[in-house]
Curated annotation (Swiss-Prot):
Span of zinc fingers (FPG-type): 236-270
Gene encoding the protein: mutM
Free-text function comment from the UniProt entry: Involved in base excision repair of DNA damaged by oxidation or by mutagenic agents. Acts as a DNA glycosylase that recognizes and removes damaged bases. Has a preference for oxidized purines, such as 7,8-dihydro-8-oxoguanine (8-oxoG). Has AP (apurinic/apyrimidinic) lyase activity and introduces nicks in the DNA strand. Cleaves the DNA backbone by beta-delta elimination to generate a single-strand break at the site of the removed base with both 3'- and 5'-phosphates.
Subunit (UniProt): Monomer.
Family the entry assigns: Belongs to the FPG family.
GO biological process: one example: base-excision repair
Enzyme Commission number(s) from the entry: 3.2.2.23, 4.2.99.18
Name of the protein in question: Formamidopyrimidine-DNA glycosylase
Active site, renumbered: P2, E3, K57, R260
Amino acid sequence: MPELPEVEVSRLGISPHIEGRTIKSVKVHDKRLRWPVPETVHKVEGHVLRSVSRRSKYLLLQTDNGCLILHLGMSGKLRVVPAETTHYKHDHIDIEFDNGQTLRLNDPRRFGALLYSESDVSGHELLSQLGPEPLTDAFNIDYLFERSRGRSQSVKTFLMDNKVVVGVGNIYANEALFKAGINPKRAAGKISKVRYQKLVPIIKETLASAIELGGTTLKDFTQVDGNPGYFAQKLQVYGRGGKLCMVCSNRLKEVRLGQRSTVYCTQCQR
């Protein structure tokens, strides 16, 4: 599943080609995505795309007549191609612009989404309850420490709660906790402020590095230009259960926390 870095990489890839252009049409070849694509998405036709921003894992395509909300789901990826480009299997949505370019969503598993918001998009039901962005000043040591107090859930599950902080998905939670030396099973409320002082900057550094390297390609994700994300080459624990720790050579342990695969080193992480 594309996580925050992959969605941000997609945003950076598409923005130069479509911002400031007029949307000619929104063509939906298959409405059967995570939620049925509403007819209201056509309200943006004939309007200039003012900006492409990101909130959590949602891309927000803002016009002066509402906003398209785009989610990549489990397997979605975006390309900007000439309008006449032949469609591939699973090309479900085309957003065509006045410069002859098309933003095309390919989504084999159809867990992606295209929705429309006419009013302030920050109040949309999908966005209104989200926690702070991890790469902003709002996500800081004091904030995370205070939110963790009284929490008995594992610190990894806590970090992946998008009401606490958005975008720290399974890959990056595994990696950040390893770098911080924190056992992912430890209760979030039992971790000291000193340890959160180490963890918060590591989360920020891990996500920023992943964005710089084009995200993580494990199976489906590619950048807008078709290239893979290269952060996969930097993974130290994710996907390495049963292999040797790169730091101490202890065998990495794999468990499930909150229905998600979790890999950690029993020696390096306490």
